[in-house]
């Protein structure tokens, strides 16, 4: 049985009126993006075995780091990884090309959950049984992550003019500054997106 993060309990469906007022910043699309290659990312996700007892962070070089559920995990603006405010050595971004924006993955097993701050300041609450793939440092044109499982994300308003894209195997969400919940477990036939706050 999946363990849900308490914050999810007060999430409510968006009304038709609210949804209509948010269409210009929030839309759902079944079409693939040309940014993150879904097939490649899904292969990356599938290749990583889910640990049974601990949260695992996999760097672009393949290094596996065990992370405590209560640890503070954050990425600085330059892509540096800090765990409990201690800098962890990783491959750094050196340019604007696809290969120069190394991808990391965090895997949360059943019965665990964790919070993570992305390089732009956006906050993730990652639920149990979830895998998230994300760049150490976002590109200038867009911000994009891939999710298999369930997360609550509070997108920072600092870069509200830059699209934030959440991809799953079933759909894509494109927002600006907003907060929402995404549920897209691999074994489930139905996926959900619940908008909590937006412009």
Language-model features and meaning:
Residues 1-3, 7-39:
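Single-pass transmembrane signal-anchor helices and their membrane-water interface zones
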Residues 40-79, 88-91, 96-199:
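Short, small/hydrophobic-biased targeting/export segments
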């Amino acid at each position: 049985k999946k363990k849900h993060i308490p914050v999810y309990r007060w999430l409510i469906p968006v009304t038709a009126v609210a949804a209509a007022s948010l269409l210009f910043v929030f839309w759902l699309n079944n079409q693939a993006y040309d940014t993150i290659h879904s097939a490649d990312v899904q292969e990356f996700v599938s290749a990583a075995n889910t640990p049974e007892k601990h949260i695992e962070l996999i760097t672009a070089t393949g290094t596996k780091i065990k992370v405590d559920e209560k640890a503070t995990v954050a990425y600085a603006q330059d892509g540096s990884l800090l765990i409990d405010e201690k800098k962890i050595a990783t491959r750094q971004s050196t340019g604007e090309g696809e290969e120069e924006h190394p991808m990391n993955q965090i895997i949360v097993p059943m019965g665990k959950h964790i919070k993570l701050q992305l390089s732009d300041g956006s906050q993730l609450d990652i639920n149990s049984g979830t895998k998230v793939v994300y760049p150490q440092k976002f590109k200038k044109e867009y911000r994009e992550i891939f999710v298999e499982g369930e997360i609550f994300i509070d997108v920072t308003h600092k870069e509200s003019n830059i699209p934030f894209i959440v991809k799953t195997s079933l759909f894509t969400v494109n927002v600006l500054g907003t907060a929402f919940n995404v549920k897209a477990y691999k074994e489930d036939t139905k996926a959900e997106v619940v908008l909590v706050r937006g412009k």
